[in-house]
Amino acid sequence: MNLDFIKSKIAAVPDFPKPGIMFRDITPLLADPQGLRKTAEAMAQELKNKGIQPTIIAGTESRGFIFGVALAEVLGLGFVPVRKPGKLPRATYSVKYDLEYGSDSLEIHQDAFKVTDEVLVVDDLLATGGTAKATVDLIEKTQAKVAGLIFVMELDSLGGREVLAGYNVSALIKF
């Protein structure tokens, strides 16, 4: 797999956005001509290894769009964007979730999925799990099934995996 390559392209930026935070910057990975493809291929291999066979991909705004579309292309699947409020033109479901500094919301179209869909959630980072859990809650409002969640990287110490207990969660790189 391409995990060493992927990890080598994620820059560690200390004290961003505030002192004491080690920010993991994916822009070098995206800037590399092979970065996005190798990441999507590694995600596809992880799904194959775990026997996860989604019928459609959901990506969370905004970096989940990047990796979600790339993975959808590799797997030959469709892609559904999970958006911030007010960005989708038709009837939506909305879920509010808590952040460390307040709250936010996510939305999807009410007709985004069929009840028979096996939805894979894709995002760049699993930290506290709040955004991922809100995305799962949105998908379940449509009566579709969550096949699993996959992330480029996971910050183990923040407990996101525990928030998603009961779901099939994968991360390519753990910090």
Swiss-Prot record:
Belongs to the purine/pyrimidine phosphoribosyltransferase family. Homodimer. GO terms for cellular component: cytoplasm. The keyword Plastid does not apply. InterPro entries: Ade_phspho_trans, PRibTrfase_dom, PRTase-like, UPRTase/APRTase. Pfam families: Pribosyltran (PF00156). Its EC number is 2.4.2.7. SUPFAM superfamilies: PRTase-like (SSF53271). NCBIfam families: apt, PRK02304.1-3, PRK02304.1-5. It is an enzyme of class 2 (transferase). It catalyses: AMP + diphosphate = 5-phospho-alpha-D-ribose 1-diphosphate + adenine. One of its GO terms (biological process) is AMP salvage. It comes from Francisella tularensis subsp. holarctica (strain LVS). Catalyzes a salvage reaction resulting in the formation of AMP, that is energically less costly than de novo synthesis. Pathway: Purine metabolism; AMP biosynthesis via salvage pathway; AMP from adenine: step 1/1. PANTHER family: ADENINE PHOSPHORIBOSYLTRANSFERASE. It is found in: Cytoplasm. GO terms for molecular function: adenine binding; adenine phosphoribosyltransferase activity; AMP binding. Coiled coil: none annotated. This is Adenine phosphoribosyltransferase. Keywords: Cytoplasm, Glycosyltransferase, Purine salvage, Transferase.
